[in-house]
A protein has these predicted regions:
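Glycine/serine-rich anion-binding loops at beta->alpha junctions
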Residues: 56-95
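General beta-strand structural signal in soluble alpha/beta enzymes
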Residues: 60, 85-89, 109-112, 127-130, ...
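A glycine-rich helix N-cap at a beta->alpha junction
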Residues: 100-126, 196-203, 207
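Active-site-proximal beta-alpha loop/turn segments in soluble metabolic enzymes
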Residues: 24-28, 137-147, 176-186, 217-220
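Short acidic, glycine/serine/threonine-rich loops at helix termini
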Residues: 72, 96-100, 131, 138-142, ...
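Well-ordered secondary-structure scaffolds
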Residues: 3, 7-14, 152, 170-387
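Acidic, glycine/proline-rich low-complexity segments that act as flexible tails and inter-domain linkers
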Residues: 1-68, 104, 282
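Phosphate/diphosphate-binding glycine-rich loops and adjacent basic-rich segments that engage nucleotide
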Residues: 121-168
Length: 387
């Protein structure tokens, strides 16, 4: 295998598909080897620019991906009370921290090293995208994995997750593990725990302290699904709109993730004011404004002109994989037309899984561009099931 030869350690854009196939096949077909995965992680991390924070204790809460969590936006706002948080993010499917914050006009995700250091020095937290500067080989290898049936290989998943942390000198990680049959970190809780043990072995070799928070990716963690909807959810939380479902996700899930690293929980009365303060500070430090945030929120809210109602009485089920894939497919259509982080559709659930629904009762509201309305309606009938 050419894992450590000169060609892999040269410029990331010079690596061939054959070399990537060798790497992926070797790791897929071999017993788990933490030393090999740690070695690959270092190569990926050092394929571009790197950050160093000699005098700061750094931390991050990355996730394994899933359609309904707000953790990559909310958790850093709490975490920065204890650590410096240089958050190198990736695009979500359908709504991750990077692409959600990108909806705010002026918010700068493509930061230089100098800008990152300045913002961290000033506020302890910034959120940015690789932009082919940080761990670019990881981005290239991820694209190859996605296209060639290597996406869910555990060793490759672990190397990819950790390479982005090593590149920006993260010393503490709580991995938000979302397990499901359509995820990349275990089909079940037992599988996810086993993979987390492997993750910890590798992270320890890299000098990173790691903890974990597990959730079932087949369940809706909160009801706002989409890029604009994620900002609307945050705004509703700020305004004290009573939504126990949303509040539990923010005040329990996101707060609990942070506490795995700090062994301390911020009191609930104080939590909201901290999140509001740090969210506002971050938006303004990275070039956005509260006014632009509120404008996106209002536009999203006003666009929810459609309603989906139950065609019969029964128990509500949601096919989370089909829901995710439907939204991502529509997003991809507009990304191909030159929009880097398009936001053409979204959902707000009024009912949760396993609730008893009456015929004609509203299950959710949604927004979608007119060109995609009929397709979206058809797909809704496939991923919303009443038994």
């Amino acid at each position: 295998m050419s894992l450590f030869n000169s060609s892999l350690n040269s410029k990331y854009d010079e690596i061939s598909k054959l070399e990537m196939e060798e790497i992926c096949s070797d790791i897929k077909n071999s017993p788990f080897d933490e030393n090999k995965i740690a070695g690959l992680t270092k190569v990926l991390a050092k394929s571009g620019e790197t950050l160093e924070f000699f005098n700061l204790d750094t931390a991050d809460i990355p996730s394994t991906g899933g359609p309904s969590s707000l953790s990559t936006i909310i958790s850093p706002l709490i975490l920065k009370e204890y650590f410096a948080v240089p958050k190198l993010g990736i695009v979500g499917r359908p709504a991750g921290g990077i692409d959600v914050l990108a909806q705010i006009q002026g918010y700068n995700l493509k930061l230089s090293k100098k800008e990152i250091y300045e913002i961290i020095d000033k506020t302890q937290y910034c959120h940015f995208i690789s932009n082919n500067h940080f761990a670019p080989l990881d981005s290239k290898l991820f694209k190859y994995r996605s296209e060639n049936n290597f996406k869910n290989v555990p060793g490759l998943v672990i190397a990819s997750l950790l390479s982005k942390k090593v590149a920006v000198d993260i010393k503490n990680v709580c991995l938000d593990v979302r397990y499901s049959h359509f995820g990349n970190f275990g089909n079940s809780l037992d599988e996810a725990i086993k993979l987390s043990d492997n993750f910890k072995l590798v992270s320890s070799l890299l000098g990173i302290n790691s903890t974990f928070y597990f959730s079932d990716n087949t369940k809706l963690l909160q009801p706002y699904i989409g890029r604009g909807e994620s900002l609307l959810a945050i705004h509703e939380y700020f305004l004290d709109i009573k939504n126990n479902w949303l509040n539990h996700h923010i005040e329990y899930d996101c707060r609990e993730m942070v506490s795995t690293l700090t062994n301390h929980k911020i009191d609930l009365p104080e939590l909201k004011s901290i999140i509001i303060k740090n969210f506002t500070e971050n938006i303004e430090c990275q070039g956005g404004s509260v006014g632009s945030f509120e404008k996106v929120v209002q536009k999203t809210k006003d666009s929810h002109i459609y309603e989906f109602s139950a065609k019969k009485s029964g128990i509500l089920r949601i096919d989370m994989m089909k829901m995710r894939d439907t939204i991502v497919k529509i997003q991809s259509k507009y990304r191909d037309k030159g929009h880097e982080f398009p936001d053409p559709c979204g959902l707000i659930f009024l009912k949760n899984q396993k609730e008893n629904i009456s015929k004609n009762e509203a299950v959710l509201t949604f927004r979608v561009l007119e060109n995609d309305l009929e397709y979206f309606k058809d797909e809704l009938n496939k991923f919303i099931i009443i038994d």
